[in-house]
Amino acid sequence: MRSQRHFFLNHIAQTTPNPLMLEIESAQGVFLYGKNGEKYIDFISGISVSNVGHCHPKVVEAIQHQSSKFMHLMVYGEYIYTPQNKLAEALLGILPDALNSFYFTNSGTEATEGALKLAKRATGRYEIASFKNAYHGSTAGALSIMGSDTYKQAFRPLIPDHLMLHFNDINEIQKVTNKTAAVVVEVVQAEAGIIKADLIFLQKLAEQCKKVGALLIVDEIQTGFGRTGLMFAFEHYRIVPDILLIGKGFGGGMPIAAFIANQDLMKELSFNPILGHISTFAANPVCCAAALASLEVILAEKLHLLAEEKGKLLESKLEKIVDKPIRRAGMMLSIQHKTMEDNFSYCNFGIEHGVIVDWFLFNEKATRIGPPLIISEEEMDWAIERLTR
């Protein structure tokens, strides 16, 4: 009989020649458990997904309750059902008044695609600006605005009229003109190794977009739902995006994302032509129920307000065991190594000792650290002890 590893390598499409190959049987809270009794602490939250931890009882209960009623009824946007409406109502309570219309999707990259279409449709323009070392997804439109030629080159030609700007460079802002449909920006460039936007830069960018009539699309797929110390990272900067992208930590572990805009703007996708953006599984009722439960957990346990304090505590503990620079935005951290080899060695050491850490897509010299927001100090110490060399 073929092993699970053999089957995985030969029949499950691979994204890299060297997958991690951890065989996980179950997960609870901040821990993953292997088939042979191995115990790992998830120090990356499944890449910014498990903000409330794995299999949170409230999320599991919501999934079980909704799945006993119905799991799919019709393609997106046709039927009225409670999980979708309740989730939208809850989001209204934590967002600025202008962001009041929600298009739920299955993944972050789908949210990006929808936002790009909406921007082009609403402005009648074609140019999309984004930033070097930015990541917004891997489908064709999102790939076109990705901030790395390394990952784009093999798939050219991509969507035309893309303007690549340098992040945190105020002189670049003037390149956003009345030809620009939208500027897509991360408040924290996660895949660059945790690079925070400068306050003045982001505020000036928002002003320029308003001045020339370009839409400001803020990507909070990794930073949203408490990861940076507020519910959304843009709140630190006193700006309001025209379109907001959310995903990853949104669903409590289930696949759901969204692009969010003002109702008047979002209506542009409903006519000329009708069905301007459609999806079969978007706003899946089970995923909506999970997302609502996850949001309720974050609010009830004040996880978003505790993330800064916990992140600072974790940073102080890491500083005692690594003599390297550490970057941090709330509970998003990176350890800066001198070489890629040093970083990969550290990541492998962590996994071998039960601590799952990883590298970044556009910064192979940095170690990614971002545990679930529910992590306790005792659990931090469990990881720190095992990361000590």
Label each region the model flagged.
Residues 1-389:
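Conserved N-terminal phosphate-binding loop of PLP-dependent enzymes in the Aspartate aminotransferase
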